[in-house]
Amino acid sequence: MSFLNFAFSPVFFSIMACYFIVWRNKRNEFVCNRLLSIIIISFLICFIYPWLNYKIEVKYYIFEQFYLFCFLSSLVAVVINLIVYFILYRRCI
């Protein structure tokens, strides 16, 4: 399995979740709270989504790079979310 096939849906869901949870939630007004929320949401979605996908499809074979791909996809999601956050944050100032 290639990294692009593995990481597209978790990264996409992570970006959408960060947009809806962080940007639509008015109680996270501090930058530090929003950054922590972005990082936590990205890591959780990118680790839990592929794992649940394999458990639901009852595939008992997890390939060697599964956890590496989870970690790399979460890093990609965090970087994309932080770039979007800082672009929108500078535009709002």
Curated annotation (Swiss-Prot):
Annotated membrane topology: Multi-pass membrane protein
Keyword Membrane: yes
Subcellular location: Cell inner membrane
Record-level GO cellular component terms: plasma membrane
Keyword Cell membrane part of the UniProt annotation: yes
Major localization listed first in the record, in broad terms: membrane
Domain of life: Bacteria
Job of this protein: Probably able to protect the producing cell against microcin N (microcin 24).
Name the record gives this protein: Microcin N immunity protein
Taxonomic lineage of the native organism: Bacteria, Pseudomonadati, Pseudomonadota, Gammaproteobacteria, Enterobacterales
Name of the coding gene: mcnI
